Amino acid sequence: MKMFFRLTRELRDELKRPLGELVRGPIPEPYLKVRGELEKHPVVTVGDVVTENVLKIGVKPIIALYDLKTKRKEYSPEIEDTAVFLTVTNPPGTITKALLDTVRKAFGLAERGRNVHILVSGEEDLAAIPAVLYAPLGTLVLYGQPDEGVVLIKVTPECKRRCAKILASMEVVRDGD
């Protein structure tokens, strides 16, 4: 049975607030501002533009999630080809069980020294939530805030609790509902 979590109207408003520190500026400014921090910790990127720009400043994310779209338009980022590639389906406005399982699997591979790229068929916009939930403490998770900059999340117990609360507040849908 397929199961997924769907974003509610109330949560949409909450998620407009960044889950971490918003680093403002036009590209590549935000990435250059956080580069020193990124070089000291494991990094997870969410989004095509974020992944491409982190790679451009010489930082290799342990896990990169993207959907080959930006602002709902097709996008072909320049990405590395030495990583393990996984694919998963995740419709817009949802977090599927398949996405949760794939992110968990990716962290298992990353623990063994592999860099992992996850190509999301659908949308990866909410993927920072499972990334934070499964990431080891101290990991940095980055996602884009369109037309504003990049959000830098330092994974802490408090941050994990906030993401778990968001996931628990989402509407649970089972195949056929």
From Swiss-Prot:
GO biological process: coenzyme A biosynthetic process
Domain of life: Archaea
Pathway: Cofactor biosynthesis; coenzyme A biosynthesis
Impact after mutating N90A: Decrease in activity
Outcome of substituting D125A: Loss of activity. Mutant shows a reduction in growth rate
Protein's name in the database: GTP-dependent dephospho-CoA kinase
Pfam families per record: DUF359 (PF04019)
Task performed by this protein: Catalyzes the GTP-dependent phosphorylation of the 3'-hydroxyl group of dephosphocoenzyme A to form coenzyme A (CoA). Can also use UTP, with lower efficiency and has weak activity with ATP, but shows a strong preference for GTP as the phosphate donor.
Entry keyword Transferase: yes
Family: Belongs to the GTP-dependent DPCK family.
Catalyzed reactions: 3'-dephospho-CoA + GTP = GDP + CoA + H(+)
Phenotype of the disrupted gene, per the record: Disruption of the gene results in CoA auxotrophy.
